[in-house]
Curated annotation (Swiss-Prot):
Protein name: Putative pentatricopeptide repeat-containing protein At3g15200
Provenance organism: Arabidopsis thaliana (Mouse-ear cress)
Pfam families noted in UniProt: PPR, PPR_2
Stretches forming PPR repeats: 142-172, 177-211, 212-242, 246-280, 281-315, 316-350, 351-385, 388-418, 420-454, 455-489
InterPro entries: Pentatricopeptide_rpt, PPR_P_subfamily, TPR-like_helical_dom_sf
GO cellular component: cytosolic ribosome
SUPFAM superfamilies assigned to the protein according to its UniProt record, in alphabetical order: TPR-like
Alphabetical UniProt keywords: Repeat
Tree of life domain: Eukaryota
Disulfide bonds: none
Protein family per UniProt: Belongs to the PPR family. P subfamily.
Length: 523
């Protein structure tokens, strides 16, 4: 980091920390005053894995009530509440409560949770339901519902309502928990409210939650997740005496720089790790190798990969897959196959991703015999090596005739692999290119029956295919149908059809001009 930037970040951090001393949870809103609302994902710490990070958009539907809404009556009640709020979203909570009473609907924790999860992209129902929970004194067995509502409000950047709900939640003893902490960190970091995110960490003890290294990891993770890597590094340096030299925290910051694509800073921080008491582990190497391969620095990546074996830090299958894919991308197929042979012999065991990386590039260069040899090997091994929809997408993409498609479909059936919208669209594109109109209509009908389409991609393929054949009227008809379904066309599709809409007008003008000339000559 530049010296000036580092000083600014450190000053910002010190300012943030100096404002974090408050006496009670009720003062939360005084520290984070409501701002002008602005219309505009969530994981648990145990789900965070480098090189295989699963960032969920939200907390998702919880498993606390696995047997909820088993009968039609419960489902209908949820739908009724959803519709009432939808049609009366501008009404007061009191009015909505009266409507619910007239309909004989008693809100329960499970019912409210179901309705909230039906409206994860709309803040208003979540906020209304939070008010109804208070007005109807709905019994809550845990903080799960409040966490879900906070998550939705934070996601939509409705921080005035967010703070109001948190204030209400704080009045309930023991409701602010680790999950609440995650939601607060996630949503503040996502909205680039760095001060507030640090403040949440500083006041964990006021929430009745232990202040520990795992919580600090969570703060660093969310800051890096939303590109505040420089701030996260400065924060880590300022807390090094408290938490010591921690390779997991350093890996998070290294990963943050790599995700930003800043290889220069990643290399600098890598040297810091080497120079520290912490020794780089498999995650450190994997993160750095991933960054180098993405930037096309395959030579340096291979040096690190070989160094892992030499120092007995054996790479895991994700690192090996990354190396194989990078070698294939650079058209160094023999070297990729050699790495594949090595790990097949001494580990780690290859998985379906390993095979798919090879298949993608082997299909591209038409190494058909080797492709089917690997597919048969996958089928023989089974388990984590079994062919999946990605496998068959590569086989379909490079099919050259209808017979090839039939062979792939037979293989899919043999492996009990279900069709996906991606696979349907691949087949659809092939049949359009081959001018197999009967097959085109057949795939279209199958997509409608299965509920997997036709989607925006299907319409785009169809429209461009018809345009190529000069069937402009039919192409325009499909375009209008696509628009009527609320699908957003690609710019190239709009340009294509707009050009054709103007052409008849130009021709009409020319025709009128010619007629006028002829008439004047006859006069």
């Amino acid at each position: 980091m530049g010296g000036k930037n580092k000083i600014e970040i450190l000053f910002q951090l010190q300012s943030a920390l100096s404002r974090r001393r408050i006496s009670s949870l009720v003062d939360f809103r005084r520290v984070f005053p409501p701002e002008t609302p602005n219309h505009k994902n969530n994981i648990t710490l145990s789900r965070f894995h480098f090189l295989g990070t699963h960032f969920l958009h939200s907390l998702g539907a919880p498993d606390k009530f696995p047997n909820r809404f088993n009968d039609d009556k419960d489902k209908q009640s949820a739908l009724d509440v959803h519709n009432i709020i939808k049609h009366h979203r501008g009404s007061s909570p009191e009015k909505i409560k009266r409507i619910l009473d007239k309909c004989g609907i008693d809100l329960t924790e499970e019912l409210v949770l179901e309705v909230v999860n039906r409206n994860r992209s709309d803040w208003k129902p979540a906020y209304i339901l939070s008010q109804l929970v208070v007005k109807q004194s709905v019994h809550l067995s845990s903080s799960m519902l409040y966490n879900e509502i906070l998550d939705v409000l934070g996601k939509m950047r409705r921080f005035e309502e967010f703070h109001q709900v948190f204030d209400e939640m704080s009045k309930r003893d023991g409701f602010v928990n680790e999950k609440t902490y995650e939601v607060l960190l996630n949503r503040y970091a996502a909205a680039h409210k760095v001060d507030e995110a640090v403040g949440v960490f500083e006041r964990r003890k006021e929430f009745g939650i232990d202040d520990d290294l795992v919580a600090f990891h969570g703060l660093l993770m969310w800051l890096c997740r939303y590109k505040h890597v420089e701030f996260a590094e400065t924060l880590f340096c300022s807390r090094r005496r408290e938490f010591g030299c921690d390779i997991k925290a350093m890996n998070m910051i290294l990963n943050g720089w790599c995700v930003l694509g800043n290889v220069h800073e990643a290399k600098r921080f890598w040297k810091d790790i080497i120079a520290s008491k912490c020794r780089p582990d498999v995650v450190s190497y994997g993160t750095m190798i991933n960054a180098l391969t993405k930037k096309g620095k395959l030579g340096k990546a291979m040096e690190l990969y070989r160094a892992m074996w030499d120092t007995r830090r054996n790479p895991d299958v994700k690192i090996c897959n990354n190396v194989i894919d990078a070698l294939c991308f650079k058209k160094r197929i023999p070297e990729a196959l050699e790495v594949f042979r090595e790990i097949s012999e001494k580990g780690p065991d290859p998985n379906v991703v390993t095979y798919n990386s090879l298949l993608k590039h082997l299909c591209k260069i038409r190494r058909t015999e080797k492709v089917w040899e690997l597919v048969e090997e996958m089928e023989l091994k089974g388990g984590s090596c079994s062919p999946n929809d990605v496998t068959f997408s590569y086989l379909l993409k490079y099919s050259q005739r209808s017979k090839d498609v039939d062979i792939v479909l037979e293989r899919m059936a043999k492996n009990k692999c279900e069709m996906t919208s991606d696979l349907y669209n691949l087949m659809f594109r092939l049949y359009v290119q081959w001018d197999k109109e009967e097959k085109v209509r057949e795939i279209w009908s199958e997509m409608e029956r299965s509920g997997l389409g036709p989607d925006q991609r299907t319409y785009t393929i169809r429209i461009h295919g018809l345009h190529t054949k000069g069937k402009i009227g039919e192409a325009l008809s499909y375009f209008q149908e696509m628009m009527s379904k609320g699908m957003v066309p690609e710019p190239r599709t709009e340009m294509l059809l707009n050009q054709n809409k103007t052409k008849p007008r130009v021709e009409d003008k020319m025709l009128r001009s010619n007629l006028t000339s002829e008439e004047s000559e006859s006069d």
